[in-house]
């Protein structure tokens, strides 16, 4: 009986810890992070873009899933090679922010590639992108081809 009482007390004392702090959801913060991300991305500001992520962040693309700061940084190094600031036109055609979710649709034309349709979805918690997905229809631009407007 004594062992049962000790076990019960231990469960009550240690098993009933206070509820873990829930992340705050602030739509204004979500919008601010999205705005910062878009601005720094379009300027090819790698350090600025990386400020939006944490070591726990995940970026999912059709080709690969990037986990943590080093892998996500590697993705953006490649993205900046595909989307150089010189000669690239990028247009966000839709932007939606609801609670902790940001969603964008965009298109871009570079000297060598056309992003006919691209989309990203972001989950933002406590001012950081914790999850992001990207998908797009990307085709090469030939010397004789006029990019789609």
Model-identified regions with their sequence ranges:
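Sec-dependent N-terminal signal peptides
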Residues: 4-13
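Short, low-complexity N-terminal intrinsically disordered segments enriched in polar/charged residues
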Residues: 16-51, 143-149
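Hydrophobic pocket/interface hotspot
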Residues: 37, 49-50, 57, 68, ...
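Short beta-strand segments enriched in hydrophobic/aromatic residues
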Residues: 53, 106-110, 136
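A short gly/proline-enriched turn/hairpin at secondary-structure junctions
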Residues: 56-67, 81-86
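Hydrophobic/anchoring residues in structured secondary elements
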Residues: 59, 95-97, 134
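Surface-exposed, charged secondary-structure patches
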Residues: 74-115
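Short beta-strand edge/turn micro-motifs at domain boundaries
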Residues: 117-146
């Amino acid at each position: 009986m004594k062992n049962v009482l000790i076990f019960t007390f231990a469960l009550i004392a240690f098993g009933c810890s206070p509820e873990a702090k829930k992340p705050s959801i602030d739509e204004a913060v979500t919008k601010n992070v999205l705005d910062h991300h878009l601005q720094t991305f379009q300027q090819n500001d790698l350090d600025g873009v990386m400020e939006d992520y944490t070591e726990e962040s995940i970026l999912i693309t059709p080709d690969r899933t990037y986990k943590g700061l080093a892998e996500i940084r590697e993705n953006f190094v490649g993205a900046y090679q595909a989307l150089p600031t010189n000669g690239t036109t990028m247009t966000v055609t839709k932007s939606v922010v609801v609670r902790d979710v940001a969603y964008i649709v965009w298109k871009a034309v570079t000297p060598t590639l056309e992003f006919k349709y691209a989309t990203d979805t972001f989950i933002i918690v406590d001012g950081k992108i914790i999850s992001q997905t990207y998908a797009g229809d990307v085709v090469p631009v030939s010397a004789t081809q006029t990019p789609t407007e």
